[in-house]
């Protein structure tokens, strides 16, 4: 019943909109200068009630501190938090190239991801630290990465990142959020990978060679008219009925929210975060990049490869509230 005494009709789109599941806002909010990624998995004797309590406290703390938080739940943990499980939610399995190069997309599937972004590195640190301490004896940190905004959304290679995203928030939501009425409605599938760049090898190439590898110009990210079959764009810019045929409509099905990182030992790269309303397009692009089904391998993998890879699901706000 509405506040005015009228019973809501779920078949009425105007009324249904009032109760549609809400995607986690931080997926689409403007990213802060500082990012913090923490991956965890349960330890022996983990208490589910404690984990749920820490998740609630973390959400409240981030809201209080002005931190954008995305919570990603792995395939093993999600059924313990909710019965609303999206279709075709798989673990990240290592993908190995078949061309004898030894290149692979490494799978390191974990159970829980915190992604925090804000202008305040100190607040990010304190908030994630408190959550980790509260989870001791229940979940262990598998890996963490601190990233940042580099220039005008640049990758460490000097190329603009995220050019291929759907244009506008409405288009991004249409691509990234499970539609109302489907299992997992309001949620989003995540591909989280830490890519490691070989910048020394990359910088030995001319700009023209680099542009052929990406399939875009370096200064302004313009699509090259002639795409080499090994270009990155040829593997990830999927189009209706084709892969990189510019005459066909683009399959605007992925929202990228990636940032670069630099570790104290000189390791640099990109923390790749992609959101999608189904998981299949995320898996499809990875298989294409590594030529796993007999195609030409993406030459970008000669200069960058993932040290980790996990698939998660970011449940709706309502699902998290009920967990």
Role assignments for model-derived ranges:
Residues 8-19:
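Short, Lys/Arg-enriched N-terminal segments with co-localized hydrophobic residues
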């Amino acid at each position: 019943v509405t506040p005015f005494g009228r019973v809501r009709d779920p078949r009425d789109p105007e009324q249904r909109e009032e109760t549609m599941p809400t995607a986690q806002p931080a997926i689409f909010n403007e990213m802060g200068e500082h990012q913090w990624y923490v991956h965890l998995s349960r330890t022996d004797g983990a208490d589910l009630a404690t984990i749920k309590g820490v998740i609630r406290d973390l959400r409240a703390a981030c809201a209080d501190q002005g931190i954008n938080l995305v919570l990603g739940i792995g395939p093993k943990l999600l059924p313990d938090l909710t019965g609303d499980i999206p279709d075709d939610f798989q673990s990240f399995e290592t993908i190995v190239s078949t061309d004898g190069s030894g290149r692979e997309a490494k799978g390191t599937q974990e159970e829980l991801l915190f992604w925090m972004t804000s202008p305040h590195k100190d607040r990010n640190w304190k908030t994630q630290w408190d959550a980790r301490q509260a989870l001791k004896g229940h979940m262990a940190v598998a890996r963490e990465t601190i990233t940042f905004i580099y220039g005008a959304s640049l990758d460490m290679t000097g190329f603009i990142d995220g050019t291929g995203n759907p244009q506008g928030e409405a288009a991004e939501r249409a691509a990234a959020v499970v539609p109302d009425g489907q299992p997992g409605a309001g949620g989003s599938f995540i591909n989280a990978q830490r890519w490691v760049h070989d910048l020394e090898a990359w910088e030995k190439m001319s700009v023209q060679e680099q542009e052929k590898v990406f399939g875009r110009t370096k200064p302004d990210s313009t699509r090259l008219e002639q795409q080499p079959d090994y270009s990155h764009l040829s593997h990830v810019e999927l189009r209706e009925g084709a892969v990189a045929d510019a005459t066909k409509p683009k399959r605007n099905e992925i929202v990228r929210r990636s940032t670069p990182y630099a570790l104290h030992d000189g390791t640099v790269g990109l923390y790749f975060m992609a959101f999608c309303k189904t998981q299949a397009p995320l898996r499809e692009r990875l298989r294409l990049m590594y030529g796993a089904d007999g195609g030409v391998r993406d030459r970008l993998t000669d200069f960058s490869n993932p040290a980790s890879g996990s698939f998660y699901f970011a449940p709706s706000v309502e699902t998290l509230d009920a967990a």
